[in-house]
């Protein structure tokens, strides 16, 4: 008996809802066909740079996933690290789908909201084993309250489980990126299909590596994926992979209206939470200084270094969560380190010199959601004639101070001098949450 199963997949939406109406119609049109379909989301659906995602702590995304008819989902780093542990523990509470992630633990047990794998039985009794793993950012999952495990070790372990070994087809939902996916395809012949994400790669008609099929659908809902899997008497016979450019799908004027409406809805929710009324609008310089003051207070630090490009727009007179989100849209937290005066000098000079090169460059990734790097600024010390001046006096090269920076400086490739330092990553608050708490304390 021949059986056709169709898998629909979406990955790395990052709250780019402008394409969502087309994606929704694509999913619903396929789900209405007389073919058994399974709809998947491969993670990084949530991104708090969108005001509605910020206002709902990701729950609005989950509701939209429900509307797509998603049945199985895994998480990316935007869920696992971008959300606090408290928010991630709650975000899927009203989901109509099953979350799978096989290399994340809450201490030593599985998260209450996820399964390490599932066995999906089709209408004709074919058994599909779905496994899922997310990229192991060891340095950030642990301070966020999670234990992240090596996905290769977890895969080896899971492949020894009888119901996975006995399944008619083994499918990996991967938020690991193309390098991991390629390695798994080369080393694990037991995996029949890898549906990829994380590195935003696109396989328009799929790839085949040593007998394992690979699919991936880019990012931001610019593409959606469809995979037709054919079985004969429960034996896998063929996998046909397709992707569809959403620019080529039928659109309607109401699509852009809907996207504008949900953005406005998010902004309105954020606007309702007033933080402070300043005597007058702040200049960019004043806004930057306030951000550094908040960083120093939160971290209990002596000195701070930032780049002015972090503040996308200066703080307005009547300042709400909406204004804060627009000014600091980044998915960044803080990092602090104890350094000697000599080390502070080396760090500052490195950041300043590299900052001169980066000043007008467009910056992407590492949580940055602004445009340009901007000017390097500092607080708590001065830099004069090649020396660090602290409390209006030169300090001994061995005297230690606590420095606070944004974590982007530690993770990005620009500032290699920080990679060798012992850095404490401060969770769970994002930079804008730190500023919000500081402003609230100012009004008490």
Residue ranges, per PLM feature:
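Acidic, metal/ion-coordinating pockets
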Residues: 1-245, 284-289, 294
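Flexible, glycine/charged-enriched surface loops at secondary-structure junctions
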Residues: 167-173, 287, 302-308, 359-363
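Structural motif
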Residues: 174-175, 308, 405-408
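Short glycine-enriched loops at secondary-structure junctions
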Residues: 79, 134, 311, 408-409
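Feature captures C-terminal
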Residues: 16-17, 315-444
């Amino acid at each position: 008996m021949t059986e056709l199963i169709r898998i629909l997949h979406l990955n790395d939406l990052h709250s780019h809802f402008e394409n969502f109406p087309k994606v929704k119609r694509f999913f619903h049109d396929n789900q209405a066909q007389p073919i058994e379909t399974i709809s998947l989301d491969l993670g990084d659906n949530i991104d708090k740079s969108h005001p509605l995602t910020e206002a709902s702590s990701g729950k609005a995304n989950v509701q939209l996933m429900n509307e797509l008819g998603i049945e199985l989902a895994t998480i990316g780093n935007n869920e696992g690290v971008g959300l606090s542990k408290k928010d991630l523990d709650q975000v899927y509470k009203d989901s109509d789908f099953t979350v799978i992630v096989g290399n994340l633990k809450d201490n030593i047990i599985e998260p209450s909201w996820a399964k390490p794998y599932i066995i999906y039985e089709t209408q004709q009794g074919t058994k599909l084993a779905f496994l899922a793993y997310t990229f192991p950012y060891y340095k950030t999952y642990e301070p966020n309250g999670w234990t992240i495990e090596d996905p290769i070790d977890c895969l080896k372990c899971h492949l020894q489980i009888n119901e996975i070994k006995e399944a008619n087809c083994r499918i990996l939902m991967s938020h690991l990126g193309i390098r991991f996916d390629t390695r798994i395809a080369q080393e694990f012949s037991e995996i029949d299909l890898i549906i990829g994400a994380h590195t935003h790669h696109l396989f328009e008609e799929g790839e085949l590596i040593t007998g394992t099929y690979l699919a991936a659908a880019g990012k931001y809902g610019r593409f959606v994926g469809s995979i037709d899997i054919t079985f004969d008497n429960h034996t896998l016979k063929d996998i046909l992979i397709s992707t569809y450019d959403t620019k080529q799908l039928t659109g309607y004027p109401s699509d852009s209206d809907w996207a504008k409406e949900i953005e406005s809805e998010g902004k309105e929710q954020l606007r309702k939470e007033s933080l402070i009324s300043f005597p007058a609008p702040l200049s960019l310089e004043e806004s930057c200084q306030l951000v550094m003051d908040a960083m120093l207070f939160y971290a209990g630090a002596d000195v701070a270094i930032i780049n002015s490009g972090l503040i996308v727009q200066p703080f307005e007179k009547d300042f709400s969560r909406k204004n804060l989100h627009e000014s600091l849209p980044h998915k960044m937290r803080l990092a602090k380190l104890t350094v000697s005066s000599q080390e502070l000098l080396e760090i500052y000079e490195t950041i300043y010199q590299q900052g001169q090169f980066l000043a007008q460059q467009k910056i992407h990734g590492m949580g940055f959601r602004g445009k340009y790097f901007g000017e390097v600024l500092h607080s708590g010390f001065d830099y004069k004639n090649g020396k660090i001046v602290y409390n209006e006096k030169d300090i001994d090269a061995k005297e230690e101070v606590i420095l606070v920076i944004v974590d982007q400086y530690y993770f990005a490739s620009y500032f290699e001098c920080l990679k060798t330092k012992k850095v404490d990553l401060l969770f769970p608050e994002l930079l804008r949450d730190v500023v919000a708490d500081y402003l609230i304390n100012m009004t008490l």
